[in-house]
């Protein structure tokens, strides 16, 4: 594997969906606090609560949805959401009822599709990946086969390249729903570009190079060369999210105590911990599926960030609730960066 090998990043995919949600909020396409029925129809509601679930409650895992299996299909999802049995008797947004929900991300991503009137994949490509020059997708079958990593568990192949390429490419709203909780495929380099947008308050900074042409001489036998030289402290800046939207993503809502590891603050999809990996504060998300263990972190103070994607490692977690190998590598990388910006 290299920094450009494309890996299914598992639950870090949720951060990508969250960034799309905030971009749509910037554009006025979606209201984070509107009831889901505004997008799904009046039959979609929690009949046990006066307060109704919203995009914001989906992003804090407090939507009041029960723990249903990951699924897809617009009519199927709408049917589920219209059933009283799909909902818990709780007030959406209440952190005391926090429950990490992959099914909730199926609903969140499809809500965004209904809001923009198209596939979230297309929105993501247009608003983030193309401006970043990133080759990544929720549809791994659309990527170059030679760039995909086979996913390994400690016992063998978790998901082969052939299996990843055999996925069908959705063409209708709702068909991608099962991909949103964990199906985004990207290289560490391209995932780091997305993390850099968050670390830099919504702006991506592309380093600027200047070309220097080497003149032909007798010694070079008429061959002319060009070298690229990095221009110090020069960047091309592209704003992809408003600073207000990044601030909203980073806003802690309540503290979750997993019992088996340190408590963390739940933000909009992102998590927050202080005094972690040698940093004063980090926003982060983990990912685990089919033998992949992954970690995306960034420090809003130094604007440094690290993305680690692994496959084939044993499942070990540290006392912070992070996958141990990812955490160890991340801490070493933060030490090396020593305050340099992303």
Predicted features and spans:
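Short, surface-exposed loop or secondary-structure junction motifs
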Residues: 47-286
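Short active-site loop at a secondary-structure junction
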Residues: 1-57, 89-103, 179-182, 303
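Short, glycine-/Ser/Thr-/acidic-enriched flexible segments
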Residues: 275, 288-290, 311-314
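Short, well-ordered loop/turn and helix-capping segments at boundaries between secondary-structure elements
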Residues: 64, 134, 200, 204, ...
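N-terminal leader/targeting segments and the immediately adjacent pre-domain N-terminus
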Residues: 1-7, 23-31, 60, 113-114, ...
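Short, well-ordered beta-strand elements
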Residues: 282, 293-313
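A short acidic/glycine-rich loop-to-helix N-cap element
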Residues: 312-325
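Short, flexible turn/loop "capping" segments at secondary-structure junctions
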Residues: 1, 170-175, 299-302
